[in-house]
From Swiss-Prot:
Known role: Snake venom serine protease homolog. May act in the hemostasis system of the prey.
Species: Protobothrops jerdonii
Full protein name: Snake venom serine protease homolog
InterPro entries per the UniProt record, alphabetical: Peptidase_S1_PA, Peptidase_S1_PA_chymotrypsin, Peptidase_S1A, Trypsin_dom
Cleaved signal peptide residues: 1-18
SMART domains (alphabetical): Tryp_SPc
CDD domains to which the protein is assigned, alphabetical: Tryp_SPc
Propeptide residue range(s): 19-24
Keywords (A to Z) from UniProt: Disulfide bond, Glycoprotein, Hemostasis impairing toxin, Secreted, Serine protease homolog, Signal, Toxin
GO BP term, example: proteolysis
Family: Belongs to the peptidase S1 family. Snake venom subfamily.
């Protein structure tokens, strides 16, 4: 009986340790291959390594984060596994790039947005299709889906060969202000995450989409380091607040200005 109790206690300790260790993993699972037809990967011609994600909003335009701007960007669409190439994968280069400000002068909490016009439109296919822009801002508490090929470990860069998806919640902006001392009283960003931690966007997820009720509501911008800490949610550029600017640029008004 004593031996049984000792073994039982050891098992309990192992389970407890495993639970604590799992909290260090950026939560989420492999995305369904059919749920991210709008998700694109950004890389540079020279490195050929993905550094950011983006979102296809129509056959000629992609939205990403200003922090993702690079020379010689390549945009890959229709990809799931980096090891198994889908037949309908398409690669494009930018024709034009638009920013609220210079890509060098965005701030962590404002105007981290880049609108890319593709040099050649893409064709909708099995694994490629645009996502809907928002008709309204997301409600507080909404369950949203964040996705990307970013690292799935909080302690070191561990990149999967498939995109991972995780469900997180829209939180009150005051939660992010409490977590990050330099945040201004208001900003055109969404605060989203899980208060207890364990699920979060992370390195190289920047520029990717936050999808709420089938609509594209946020662009991955920044968050705590390491990722996934309790009460350290992520910040996402609020797409709804930039709709007029986005639509004006697409309509041909290249002098359109972002909201203040």
């Amino acid at each position: 009986m004593v031996l049984v109790r000792v073994l039982a206690n050891l098992l309990m300790l192992q389970l407890s340790y495993a639970q604590k260790s799992s909290e260090l993993i950026i939560g989420g699972d492999e995305c369904n291959i059919n749920e991210h037809r709008f998700l694109v990967a950004l890389y540079t011609f020279r490195s050929r390594r993905f550094h950011c994600s983006g979102t296809l909003i129509n056959e000629e335009w992609v939205l990403s984060a200003a922090r993702c701007d690079r020379k010689n960007i390549r945009i890959q669409l229709g990809m799931h596994s980096t090891n198994v190439i889908n037949e309908d994968v398409q690669t494009r280069v930018p024709k034009e790039k638009f920013f609220c400000l210079s890509s060098k002068t965005y701030t962590k909490w404002n105007k981290d947005i880049m609108l890319i016009r593709l040099k050649k439109p893409v064709n909708n296919s099995t694994h490629i299709a645009p996502v809907s822009l928002p008709s309204n801002p997301p409600s507080l508490g909404s369950v949203c889906r964040v996705m990307g090929w970013g690292t799935i470990s909080a302690t070191k860069e561990t990149h999967p060969d498939v995109p991972y998806c995780a469900n997180i919640n829209i939180l009150d902006y005051s939660v992010c202000r409490a977590a990050y001392a330099r945040l201004p009283a208001t900003s055109r960003t969404l605060c989203a995450g899980i208060l207890e931690g364990g699920k979060d966007s992370c390195l190289t997820d920047s520029g990717g989409p936050l999808i709420c009720n089938g609509q594209f509501q946020g662009i991955v911008s920044w968050g705590g380091h390491p990722c996934g800490q309790p009460r350290k949610p992520g910040l996402y550029t609020k797409v709804f607040d930039h709709l007029d600017w986005i639509k004006s640029i697409i309509a041909g008004n290249k002098d359109a200005t972002c909201p203040p």
